Design a protein with these regions (language model features):
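Active-site-proximal substrate-binding core of FAD-dependent oxidoreductases
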Residues: 392, 420-459
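Helical element adjacent to the flavin cofactor pocket in flavoenzyme catalytic cores
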Residues: 165, 172-176, 198-256, 260
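Glycine-rich Rossmann-fold phosphate-binding loop(s) that bind the pyrophosphate
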Residues: 62-66, 88
């Protein structure tokens, strides 16, 4: 979601919760199994792997939102293109099938882009993101994808004096970037939307919707295939080179090779330190009865977040559960979560920590069952800025680094890749999207281990300590530990 900490969003896991293949925890909680979003309908039927060497006009590596949206818009724009998507597991195995279901207008690094390219350039990026929420809903409707979409907006709440100060600053900044339809609420108005214990204020934007992540990715994959795009699953790409995507089963040769791997980028040869695979974890309750919802409210089904440094994110699902997430164990040494596919479930201590947040926000949920827990990785560039790139000399392109805000951002990134390829191939000139400030942004790699591990864990330890200190502090100033952590992170 849009981040007061990072100006332009690194907040709630829009494109990044999910790993794990475990079963139970002994408490009635299904732990792992991809995510809660697959619990009812199960894993989709597998598509055939790559049968051998092949050629294409465009080869897309990664069958999540970024890859599928890119295939969709390219094929719509140029129907004769031969497009192949290579997916290591199945479409939606990664963050696209595990995230918090936040379709919203946050984009990681917007404030940094304002510094680099000017305020008006960043305003254009923000407007494009605002419009993207409606674009995703439009395509879902056009393609008859039932993804439980409900456009209730996004509500960010503050529960301490320091959080309230950050909220007000965040609200002012968002308006300065053109979001003039955003509204600021006091404690009473906040409670009229959602009764969060201790909430002293909130900021609401209409540019957001709740959705079911797996339903969206499954529907999008089907729509892409219906257009004539070839999808090969169970086909891990081990190396990307100009005009070559190399797999254990053969090599796909194409003028354009697009890397759309987000949190799994570290699995590719030579890309271990490009984007850090940050972990995020979630829980989903049992369906809650009417008497509990009467105490909570939340009738507008806004996506819900807070202004803590180690923030939470949540939605009220279509079947009246609360799905809630947070950072949990933030990073595994050596980018291991990406390289090994995922650990065997979410650590019990993380599950209990998320339950504590749930009950702290909504005390009447104290006795409810947690039906599912899962965890996963999202992609974080060293400067925390999402980017879209096409190298015109090599034909290599990539998009990502959404820092957990990818459900909508992937769509804008895909349309931008489409325009960049059409421009490069001489089919069009520059467009509004190809001139956005995140295009062809360059960033250095992450530090080698153990500095990477120490930095990330030190940062989140500082955030959690700062949040704890702020709960008892009357001062509106953010705790010094959090400010120090922001400097360590390079935000």
């Amino acid at each position: 979601m849009t981040s007061a900490n990072n100006g332009g969003s690194d907040r709630h896991t829009g494109d990044g919760s999910g790993t794990g293949t475990g079963t139970g925890t002994g408490t009635g909680t299904s732990n792992g199994g991809i995510s809660f979003w697959y619990a009812k309908d199960g894993i989709p039927a597998p598509r055939e792997p790559l049968p051998g060497d092949a050629t294409a006009d465009v080869c897309i590596v990664g069958g999540g939102y970024t890859g599928l949206w890119t295939a969709y818009y390219l094929k719509k724009a140029v129907p004769f293109l031969n497009i192949t998507v290579l997916e290591g597991k199945f479409c939606g195995y990664g963050a696209s099938g595990r995230n918090g279901g936040w379709l919203y207008n946050g984009v990681a690094g917007r404030d940094r882009y304002a510094e680099l390219h000017g305020h008006e350039s960043a305003v254009r990026l923000q407007k494009a993101m605002n419009d993207t929420v409606a674009e995703v809903i439009r395509v879902a409707d056009e393609e008859k994808i039932d993804a439980d979409i409900h456009r209730g907006g996004v509500l960010e709440v503050a529960r301490t004096p320091a959080q309230l100060a950050r909220l007000k600053e965040f609200h002012t900044v968002e308006i300065a970037f053109g979001e003039t339809d955003r509204t600021l609420h006091g404690a009473r108005e906040t409670a009229e939307r959602v009764r969060v214990t201790g909430a002293v204020g909130s900021s609401w934007t209409p540019h957001g919707a709740r959705l079911h992540p797996a339903k969206l990715v499954k529907g999008l994959a089907a729509a892409v295939e219906a257009l004539g795009v070839t999808i090969h699953e169970s086909t891990p790409v081990t190396e990307i080179k100009p005009k070559h995507a190399i797999t254990p089963y053969g090599t796909v040769r194409a003028p354009y090779i697009l890397r759309c791997t987000e949190g799994f980028t570290a699995t590719l040869k030579g890309a271990r330190r490009a984007w850090l695979p940050m972990n995020s974890s979630m829980i989903a309750t049992e369906p809650l009865p009417a008497e509990i919802w009467d105490t909570i409210g939340w009738d507008g089904r806004e996506t819900l977040g807070d202004m803590a440094h180690a923030y939470m994110y949540a939605q009220r699902t279509a079947d009246d559960r609360i799905a809630l997430g947070g950072r949990g164990y933030p990073y595994r040494y050596g980018s291991r979560a990406a390289r090994l596919g995922h650990p065997s479930g979410t650590d019990p201590a993380t599950i209990e920590a998320l339950r504590d947040i749930l009950v702290d926000f909504f005390p009447t949920t104290a006795g409810v069952r947690i039906d599912h827990a899962w965890s996963g990785v999202l992609g974080v560039p060293r400067d925390w800025c999402a980017t879209v790139t096409l190298d015109r000399t090599t034909g290599l392109g990539w998009a990502g680094g959404y820092v957990g805000s990818g459900v909508a951002t992937t769509n804008l990134a895909a349309r931008t890749l489409r325009d960049l390829i059409q421009q490069d191939s001489g089919q069009s000139g520059p467009t509004d999207l190809t001139t956005l400030p995140w295009v062809n942004h360059k960033v250095r790699n992450w530090e080698p281990e153990p500095f990477r591990w120490l930095g990330v864990h030190g940062m989140y330890a500082a955030y959690r300590t700062a949040d704890h200190k702020e709960t008892t502090s009357p001062t509106p100033r953010s705790h010094p530990l959090a400010r120090a952590a922001n400097r360590i992170a390079g935000r």
